[in-house]
Amino acid sequence: MMNFIRTLLIYEIILLKIYHIIKLLHQQQVVAYPTEAMFGLGCDPDSEKAVHTLLTLKKRDWQKGLILVAANYEQLANYIDDNSLNINQRARMFSLWPGPITWTIPARTTTPCWLTGKFSTLAVRISAFKPVRMLCLAFGKPIVSTSANVSGQSPARNICEVRQQFGAAFPVMDQIIEGRYSPSEIRDAISGQLIRRG
């Protein structure tokens, strides 16, 4: 019984943290949150203002494009061209999802360039990490996912490292990362080709 109560309290604390972060996302702010391997910077992918702020904070070239992380495939429907994938390509993707694999999929023509950068594809991932899934489910859509670091510096693996790079008042979802040490692997969904080793 005590373990059950402890589990409920932990989930309640996580939910309170998530709803605080969601409030900031709705205000077009950039936040830091835990992922499988490191802390990520995230924002509302539909807000050009928020994405511009994120890119400025990271000192990242917009042409490189960004990754969206989602709780499920349905959340990606407004951003990717699912019709461009055949049954085998979909099966290959879903055999590795949810998990730390990012796939580049042809983007919809309506997907903004601040997400795709110079590419006609969009990098997307369905996370298996419970805090990320809960965050995306509560937000009702994917969030931008990029490592929490200024370009050229090491990715932040804890709250102190996030705040060293982005300031003591930077909003962070206080949660322990899963323990992986490498970023997500990136593959092309059409060809299966490895783009970045994880």
Swiss-Prot record:
Keyword field contains Transport: no
Lineage: superkingdom: Bacteria
Pfam families hit by this protein: Sua5_yciO_yrdC
Reactions catalysed, as given in the entry: L-threonine + hydrogencarbonate + ATP = L-threonylcarbamoyladenylate + diphosphate + H2O
Keywords: ATP-binding, Cytoplasm, Nucleotide-binding, Nucleotidyltransferase, Transferase, tRNA processing
GO cellular component: cytoplasm
Gene Ontology molecular function, alphabetical: ATP binding; double-stranded RNA binding; L-threonylcarbamoyladenylate synthase; tRNA binding
Record bears the keyword tRNA processing: yes
Function: Required for the formation of a threonylcarbamoyl group on adenosine at position 37 (t(6)A37) in tRNAs that read codons beginning with adenine. Catalyzes the conversion of L-threonine, HCO(3)(-)/CO(2) and ATP to give threonylcarbamoyl-AMP (TC-AMP) as the acyladenylate intermediate, with the release of diphosphate.
Protein known as: Threonylcarbamoyl-AMP synthase
Biological source species: Baumannia cicadellinicola subsp. Homalodisca coagulata
